[in-house]
Amino acid sequence: MKHETNIEALHQAKKRLELEYNKKQLAIEISITAGSRVVEELWERKIMQYSLSSSNRRKFMMYAVRASYDNEPITYNQLKKLLNISDIALTTMWRECSDAGWIVTTKAKRANQTLLASDNLLKSYNNYMAHVRQAYKNSGLRTLAQAIVEMEHLIAHEDYENR
């Protein structure tokens, strides 16, 4: 009976920790998607506004950044498949970002054209990630995540000990 009570108490505590974690994570995600980060530079603010204006634009820019981080340009066709969008939509995003100087493209025919993020897009994303890291640090999510892991270990140990 005591074993069942201990296990139940551990499960309840774990559920409360998970709920608190979920609430804090949700607050961070809402803050990010609401564009709550204050950006001083106009060029960076324009990148932020563009990337937050639609999920496809955000993903387009993230794929450009990843291509640059990996030093592996991404093709038009790869992006079309990844984003699952029409030629018109992709061509429009590509042109808008190229005209704004946020991507560097090759001059090949459209299907084989490749892109990488520009230095400003990379700098903007790096600044954004510094903001996200600080938000996570301030939220205490890491501590909550570790507490959940420890709770799982206690539950597993309690189950094992009382078999």
Which residue stretches match the model-derived regions?
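A short, conserved structural fragment
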Residues: S98-A108
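Short acidic, hydrophobic short linear motifs in intrinsically disordered regions
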Residues: D70-L82
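Short, cationic-aromatic polyanion-contact patches
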Residues: A108-H131
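C-terminal regulatory/oligomerization modules of transcriptional regulators
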Residues: M1-L19, I148-R163
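Short alpha-helical segments that sit at the start of domains
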Residues: I32-M62
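Short, locally clustered residues in the helix-turn-helix/winged-helix DNA-binding domain
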Residues: M61-Y69
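Amphipathic alpha-helical dimerization/coiled-coil segments
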Residues: N127-R163
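Short amphipathic alpha-helical interaction segments
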Residues: N84-D99
